[in-house]
Design a protein with these regions (language model features):
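C-terminal alpha-helical "lid" subdomain
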Residues: 2-58, 273-274, 281-362
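Mid-core helix/loop region of P-loop NTP-binding domains shared across ATPases and GTPases
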Residues: 51-65, 148-150, 163-170, 178-236, ...
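N-terminal pre-Walker A segment at the start of P-loop NTPase domains
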Residues: 77-98
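Phosphate-binding P-loop
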Residues: 100-108, 146
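Conserved lysine of the Walker
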Residues: 121
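Hydrophobic positions on the alpha1 helix immediately C-terminal to the Walker A/P-loop
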Residues: 124, 128
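Post-Walker A helix-loop "phosphate-sensing" segment adjacent to the P-loop in P-loop NTPases
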Residues: 131-143, 177-179
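The catalytic "switch" region of P-loop NTPases
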Residues: 213-215, 222-303
């Protein structure tokens, strides 16, 4: 926890270097410690657990067969395939972190990941954040005898109806900075900025940014707070939200300020064709190669690419949910393979079912 003490002159808290509890030990797949796993990823303990836990991996040649329960757990978690949006975001984050490394006066360049629901925005954000975390710990391992592990990445969710105080409190909660109802927003902000810089945060990921509405008084104050934080915290900020360019975030004076500092990355549906490539079919191939089913016929998913593209509208979130549910069904019913009938039987989210399920041909 971070200790705050009021100064005699101002009564404002001054923060001591962060006293962070030891993170959970890295664990193998599907054996996460219950207590460690209970921390949300919007706390640094939860983030450490997420970043250092080995992600699900497909079966490897020569590997002992997994049990039924292990395979069910594997398809429940499943792999993250590298989509074009993830590749673009990873490249841009790496470049902007270098670009802003020695920028001291004004806010560093930022990124905004935008797109429709179920397009993989949060997945891309978390994947790039984990990569940054692991790269930093490899580059700068903890000093011998150090009580505090590195905290290079912060992940914050914008709360519904965010005000400046509730938003800055979310920043404080991530590092366990104690706050009270009697503390002013300025006091919490001072503690957050000091502690984030002391802890060495280099990348701040802010999800659900579309929840901010600068057209309201409280929303405008929250947007101003974000601008203040980007200027005071020595880190690269990456935002993600639903169709951000069509929201009030990009309009008016405040919107113009954000648009002038941020590079936009569109995380949209995977196209069936892009020039000479087939991004959607390539993703299907990657997902199929990751399956752990005993009797699945290779090539089945790419063969049904037109049907799957229409069914999911090319959205990676809907697609991975469909494949995961179909795989779990195949294990449960003993067929151990995904067929067109298996895919047809899966009920997806309401939006996909209402707008994109192909009409049955008679």
């Amino acid at each position: 926890m971070v200790n705050t003490h009021p100064t005699p002159a101002t009564g404002h808290p001054t923060t001591q270097p962060p006293q962070l509890p030891e993170p959970p030990e890295p664990s193998g797949p599907y054996t996460a410690d219950t207590e460690a796993a209970s921390w949300p990823v919007t706390t640094w303990q939860g983030w450490q657990h997420f970043a250092t836990t080995e992600p699900p991996a497909p079966p490897q040649p020569g590997q002992a067969p997994r049990t039924r329960e292990e395979r069910l757990a594997y398809h429940s978690a499943f792999v993250t395939v590298r989509t074009p949006a993830i590749n673009t975001l990873a490249h841009q984050v790496r470049t902007l972190m270098i670009l802003g490394r020695h920028q001291q006066i004004t806010a560093r360049p930022s990124l905004i990941v935008t797109g429709p629901p179920a397009a993989g925005k949060t997945t891309a954000l978390l994947h790039v954040g984990r990569t940054c975390h692991l790269a930093h710990t490899l580059r700068t391992p903890p000093t011998q005898g150090s009580a505090h592990p590195a905290v290079p990445v912060a992940y914050v969710l914008v709360p519904p109806g965010a005000t400046a105080k509730t938003l800055t409190t979310e920043f404080a909660r991530y590092l366990g900075i104690p706050t009270t109802t009697r503390m002013t927003q300025a006091q919490i902000t001072d503690a957050v900025c000091h502690t984030y810089n002391t802890a060495g945060i280099q990348l701040v990921l802010i999800d659900e940014i579309h929840r901010l509405n600068p057209r309201t008084t409280t929303g405008a104050q929250a947007a101003d707070l974000l601008k203040d934080l980007t200027e005071r915290i020595r880190a690269t900020f990456v935002y993600a939200g639903i169709d951000v360019t069509t929201t009030p975030l990009f309009t008016g004076v405040r919107g113009a300020q954000l648009a002038a500092r941020a590079t936009l990355i569109h995380c949209g549906p995977l196209p069936a064709h892009h020039g000479q490539t087939r991004p959607f079919t390539d993703t299907l191939t990657d997902l199929e190669n990751a399956l752990d089913l005993h009797h699945h016929t290779p090539g089945t998913l790419p063969h049904h690419a037109p049907y799957l593209h229409q069914r999911t509208a090319g959205r990676i979130g809907s697609l991975t949910r469909l494949i995961r549910q179909a795989a779990i069904t195949a294990i449960h019913n003993g067929t151990e393979k995904i067929t067109k009938a298996t895919l047809d039987a899966v009920q997806l989210d309401h939006h996909a079912e209402t707008h994109h399920r192909p009409t049955t041909q008679h």
